[in-house]
Regions:
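Proline-aspartate-enriched helix->loop->beta-strand connector
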Residues: 131-137, 141-155, 171, 267-284
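N-terminal low-complexity, Pro/Thr/Ser-rich intrinsically disordered segments
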Residues: 37-67, 71-76
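Bacterial lipoprotein signal-peptidase II cleavage site
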Residues: 21-33, 40
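Bacterial N-terminal signal peptides that target proteins for export
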Residues: 2-13
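A short, structured surface patch at a secondary-structure boundary
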Residues: 86, 90-144, 152-154
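Bacterial N-terminal signal peptides
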Residues: 12-21
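Alpha-helical, coiled-coil/dimerization segments enriched in small aliphatic residues
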Residues: 240-263
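Extracytoplasmic substrate-binding proteins
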Residues: 58-65, 72-74, 161-236, 256-258, ...
């Protein structure tokens, strides 16, 4: 997967530049000499968020999807009523399809995030989606689901019993897998194929990698990796997982990275041993940087940890969705991390402008200053 992520774009994809090259000084000069200034391909306003459509139907109008269980699903045509149990799905669906009223049901946790996110400004139709058919652990109430008259339902690939009971009720189910950029690309391709927008999938995926390549080029000469700790909840940290991807590209080391899991129990003695220089608090928890910086947590003394002493504690942002898991805004997560960890390489990069340009390119949406502050304002220490 690493080779795929680090691939170079052809001159055709680099013919137009939407975002300014990141970096400054010698690092920026080196990046420019390696032609990184042409690394971000443009998605035109006419294309974003809806690109030219491509006919994916057979002669009888059937659309064929192969899901991440290797199962073939045949749809009678572009579905008018789509339902998902998967939390990040709505904003990825929106990035591919644009404004629509096709998504009629989603996970209640998706709506919790939606109400805190920029997606509520871009995709107001989602507010009316039903959440009565599923709980936060992805267990489906088939009777409630049937009331939604879904053409297709998206469910996690490991929820075997849930998939079976829906299929037994005559409901078509597409299974998706979580965890990697390859998986994310497959989601985008499946959604695009299903909705008759295959060209849009390529645009999004190419633009994603162009932004990641931009950071890679700016950090090419940087050998100092930041020592960062990822807090997923009180006295819980993230070990191995998707975070390894964005830490690799932003050049940071997680001292808990050899441990397996995303919610590992720890104690303060372990934190003192690791002594991280930067701490990131996940967006799925209610913890805030002030809880550590002001030593508010009972029985825990964070004041002696380098990250706290130096004020380097940050909250992971929520944009269209939380930036923690794989998503279309993962390149923004990487840029945000890289600027914090290596400020000398990104001295001239304005993160507000990066987010603004990204939203215009991907969603064809103009963020206001107030919206930008909602995305980034509370993430700083």
């Amino acid at each position: 997967m690493k080779n795929k992520v680090l691939k170079k774009f052809t001159a055709l994809l680099c013919s137009a530049v939407l975002l300014t090259a990141v970096g400054c000084g010698n690092v920026q000069q080196n990046a420019e000499e390696s032609q990184s200034e042409a690394s971000v391909s443009e998605i035109s306003e006419e294309q974003a968020p809806l690109s030219a459509e491509k006919d994916n139907k057979s002669e009888d109008g059937t659309i064929t999807i192969v899901d991440q269980l290797g199962k073939t699903i045949e749809l009678d045509g572009v579905p008018e009523r789509v339902v998902t149990t998967i939390m990040p799905f709505p904003y990825i669906f929106y990035a591919v399809v644009g404004n629509n009223d096709n998504l009629v049901g989603c996970n209640p946790s998706s709506i919790v995030a939606y109400n805190d996110s920029a997606l509520k400004y871009m995709y107001p139709e989602l507010a009316s989606a039903s959440t009565d058919f599923v709980d936060t652990s992805f267990v489906v109430n088939v009777e409630e689901l049937i009331k939604l008259k879904p053409d297709v339902v998206f469910q996690w690939n490991y929820m075997d019993d849930e998939i079976k009971k829906m299929e037994d009720a005559g409901i078509k189910v597409i299974a998706l897998q979580y965890g990697s950029i390859d998986d994310l690309e497959t989601w985008i391709q499946i959604i695009a194929t299903m909705m008759g927008k295959e060209d849009r999938a390529k645009e999004l995926i190419d633009y994603f990698h162009a932004n990641v390549d931009e950071v890679d080029a700016a950090l090419a000469g940087v050998e100092d990796y930041s020592n960062v700790l990822l807090i997923s909840d009180d006295m819980k940290v993230t070990g191995t997982g998707f975070s390894s991807y964005w830490l690799e590209h932003s050049k940071a080391i997680n001292p808990a990275g050899d441990l397996s899991g995303e919610a590992l129990n720890i104690n303060m003695e372990q934190v003192y041993e690791w002594n991280p220089s930067i701490i990131y608090i996940g967006n799925f928890t209610q913890l805030q940087p002030s809880d550590l910086l002001e030593n508010k947590l009972e029985g825990e003394d964070w004041s002696v940890v380098d990250a706290v002493k130096n004020g380097e504690v940050y909250k992971i942002p929520i944009g269209g969705y939380r930036w923690d898991p794989p998503g279309v805004e993962t390149p923004l997560m990487i840029k945000w991390l890289a600027k914090i960890q290596h400020p000398e390489a990104f001295e001239n990069m304005d993160m507000n402008e990066e987010v603004r340009k990204f939203y215009k390119a991907v969603y064809n949406f103009e963020l206001t200053d107030e919206m930008l502050d909602e995305i980034l304002g509370d993430t700083q220490n």
